Amino acid sequence: LREEFGESIIDNFVDEYISGRTPNPCVLCNTHIKWEALLKRADMLNCKYIATGHYARIRQVNGRYVIYKGVDEIKDQSYVLWGVSQDCLSRTIFPMGKYHKDEIKRLAIDLGYESLAKKSESYEICFIPDNDYRSFLKRRVKGLEEKVQNGDFLNTSGEVIGKHDGYPFFTIGQRKLGKSFGKKPSYVIGIDPSNNTVTIGSKQDLNKQIMHIRDVNFGKLSSIKDG
């Protein structure tokens, strides 16, 4: 799976940042890699179902398998499972979904897995263990740093208000900008890869009435009609 993971997940991760967007590699991995591999292995072992440790739940609604949030809303992982197909969900069990994380840890200790229960949690992307995606992009894209350095920060009027190290190193909604633009907090509200600019605005500027979406899964519905 290493080659397929590199092409489907890592290459997409890099391409999205270069396109000025922020990717979520876990969604793609679940959709295109993890479930396919697990079910293939399950078929080899003549297993009807697979179980994963995701904090989410599955219910049948109108003949369709629908993902719901786990009982533990703090640890909920339903949002990274939206792309998993109906066929895959029909063979999937989420035993963790009806528990809180603290309950799982107590169960692990009671069953003799105390060291596992006390293991620190990881929030990093699996292929970026140091969680430094900027350095990762620089290693993956030859000459990236030289190409995107000395980009312009713009205000909402399009005026240049400062310099940055490259648009791929920012994400919409980001507040930590490496410099101050006044007394009030500033946020990234726009990224333009074509001219290497990052637009800065207020938190209110992040509020939008229109958004563009793609790769939609309607959950309870197989499709929706226009109008």
Segments and roles (model prediction):
Residues 56-58, 188-191:
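A structural signal for short hydrophobic beta-strand segments in well-ordered beta-sheet cores
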Residues 150-169, 182-189:
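Short beta-strand/strand-turn micro-motif
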Residues 150, 170-175, 225-227:
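Short coil-to-beta transition motif at edge beta-strands of beta-rich domains
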Residues 184-186, 192-227:
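Basic, glycine-rich polyanion-binding accessory segments appended to enzymes
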Residues 123, 169-180:
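A short, polar/charged loop-to-alpha-helix boundary motif
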Residues 1-117, 121, 126-147:
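Core alpha/beta nucleotide-donor-binding catalytic domains of modification enzymes
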Residues 106, 156-157, 194:
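Short, ordered coil/turn segments that flank beta-strands lining enzyme active or ligand-binding pockets
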